[in-house]
Amino acid sequence: MKNKFDTLTVETGVKSKKKYPIYIGKAILNLLDKVIPRNVSVLIVIDSRIARLHRDKITRLIEFLTESRTVNQIIIPGEEDSKSLSVSESLYEKAASLNLDRSSWFIGIGGGVVGDLTGFVAATYMRGANLLHVPTTLLAQVDSSVGGKVAINQSGYKNLVGNFYQPKAVIIDTNFLDTLPIRELRAGLAEVFKYGILCDRELFLTVKSLFEDCEPLNNVSWERYSYLIHKSCEIKADIVSQDEIDTGIRMLLNLGHTFAHALEGATSYNYFKHGEAVMWGLAMSAELSYKLNKLTYKDYQAIAELPELTKVPEVPIQVKDPNIIEELLLRDKKKTGEELTVILPTSIGSAEICKCPATALIKVILES
C-alpha cells in the first residue's frame, strides 16, 4: 500500500520558470527513488542525531537507493559550528575522492544546519550539482528547506558566504517529528507564527491554539503538523515565485529575523534555538510597529505575548549591552548606511518593509 502525500510546486525565476516539487506526508522516504535518476552517484549528508535515532530507517533507505545507484554517506553534527569553511572543505574532499561530477546528487537529511551546508556545497561543487532536501526538524520543514537560500558562517557573521540555489525536490516526512524534542517543535512553530502574521490571521490563531490548549507539542497529531507545514510551504512558495533572490516582496520573510540574529549573536549562538530568537524577534517587531502607530494595540498584544505564551527562554542580561547590540545590528545584510531594512507587522495578516535607524531597534531590545 502506498502512503499518501501532498505535493506543492515551487516556481522560481520569472524568466526561467524553473519548478520543483515539495512532497509532504508520513513515511514517504521511498519518494527519493522517484526523484533521483538511476545510475548516478549520490552523497548523503546526515545529521548525527538523525543517524543515531533513525539508524534502521536510514540504513534501509541507503540499501534501497544503492540497488540502482552509487551511494555514499557522511555524518556531521547538526550544530551551527558545522556551517563552516572547514566542514565544507571536508565535503568537497569526500565528493572529489568519490569522483562525483555535476550529474551527481547531494542529499541533506537533517535540520537547517545540514540543509544550509549541503546546499552550499552542492551549489559550489563544480559550479553546481544536483541537490535534494530531506528536512527533519519542524523549522527546516516549514522554512529553511524551501526557497533556495544556502550559506555558511564566517568571521563571526552568520550566513556571510552563500547564494541562492534551488533543490530538485524537497521531501518532508513527518515521521521525523516523532523524535524531535519539544523545544525544537516550539522553535519551528515560531516560523509558522511568522507566516500567519505576514498574511494569514487564521493560521496565526491555529498555531496559537496549540499553546492555549496546553497539549504537549509532541502529542499533536501528524495530520495537524502536516496542515501547518503545507500552509507554511504554500505561503513561502508563493512569495519565492514572485521574488527568488530577495530584492522585493521576499524580504517580508525576514519578519522578526533582524532582531533574532542580533539576539543570537549577542548570546554566541549557543543560548537560543533559532526559532526561539525569532519568537522574540516577532514580539520586538510588533512593539516597534506599535510605537510607530502602524499596528493596533490589540494585534500588538497578541504578538507581544508570544514569548511568554510559548515559554521560550528569557532574554539574558548580556543582551542589554547597547554597544554589542549596535555592532550586531550593523552587521545585518539588510543595512544601508546607518539604517536597517526591517519588516513590521501592520496587522495580524499583513506587514510592510520599512527603513529604521539602528537606534530604534536597539531601544526595543534593551527594553525587552
From Swiss-Prot:
Its cofactor is Co(2+); Zn(2+); NAD(+). GO terms for cellular component: cytoplasm. CDD domains: DHQS. It comes from the Bacteria. InterPro entries: Dehydroquinate_synthase, DHQ_synth_AroB, DHQ_synth_fam, DHQS/DOIS_N, DHQS_C. Gene3D superfamilies: 3.40.50.1970, Dehydroquinate synthase-like - alpha domain (1.20.1090.10). The keyword Ligase does not apply. The keyword Zinc applies. It is an enzyme of class 4 (lyase). NAD(+) binds at residues 112-116, 136-137, 149, 158, 176-179. It holds the Pfam family DHQ_synthase. Zn(2+) binds at residues 191, 257, 274. Disulfide bonds: none annotated. It catalyses: 7-phospho-2-dehydro-3-deoxy-D-arabino-heptonate = 3-dehydroquinate + phosphate. Its EC number is 4.2.3.4. Keywords: Amino-acid biosynthesis, Aromatic amino acid biosynthesis, Cobalt, Cytoplasm, Lyase, Metal-binding, NAD, Nucleotide-binding, Zinc. Its main location: cytoplasm. One of its GO terms (biological process) is amino acid biosynthetic process. One of its GO terms (molecular function) is metal ion binding. Binds 1 divalent metal cation per subunit. Can use either Co(2+) or Zn(2+). Catalyzes the conversion of 3-deoxy-D-arabino-heptulosonate 7-phosphate (DAHP) to dehydroquinate (DHQ). Belongs to the sugar phosphate cyclases superfamily. Dehydroquinate synthase family. This is 3-dehydroquinate synthase. The lineage of its organism: Bacteria, Bacillati, Bacillota, Clostridia, Natranaerobiales.
